[in-house]
């Protein structure tokens, strides 16, 4: 059932609000995907706080107008699903991971930091560890010398106690 003008304006406003908060937008062609698989993809996207939506391309073009994602409008052709995320890599990671297990979902393009990326760029973005993973690695690297120093002091204290006894 076609949308009337007010419904279209509401959809554009909703998507524009998501795009205004977003750091990344990923476009993927979903031709031939079963409904169950699409539902699985949506559930994974929700877990990662990725806004995922099948949208008419004309409405999507209107939603990205005047944003850093406007150059992406040239890529908006064919049946597309739009992944929009405030996290820099979450949308790319969700769509890329799903496309590995389902060859009917084809990554078409993406945009990050005002730059349009092709499929390889989106895959490269998806391969970057999440912020939490990077922070935990940094913490481990910073903590290792301190814990090593603490173990050395404890061993020295034990040695002094053994010599004193």
Swiss-Prot record:
Stored CDD domains: Ribosomal_L10
BP GO terms, sorted: translation
Keywords attached to this entry: Ribonucleoprotein, Ribosomal protein, RNA-binding, rRNA-binding
Gene Ontology molecular functions: large ribosomal subunit rRNA binding
InterPro entries in alphabetical order: Ribosomal_uL10 (IPR001790), Ribosomal_uL10-like_sf (IPR043141), Ribosomal_uL10_bac (IPR022973), Ribosomal_uL10_bac_type (IPR047865)
Physiological role: Forms part of the ribosomal stalk, playing a central role in the interaction of the ribosome with GTP-bound translation factors.
Subunit organization: Part of the ribosomal stalk of the 50S ribosomal subunit. The N-terminus interacts with L11 and the large rRNA to form the base of the stalk. The C-terminus forms an elongated spine to which L12 dimers bind in a sequential fashion forming a multimeric L10(L12)X complex.
Record's protein name: Large ribosomal subunit protein uL10
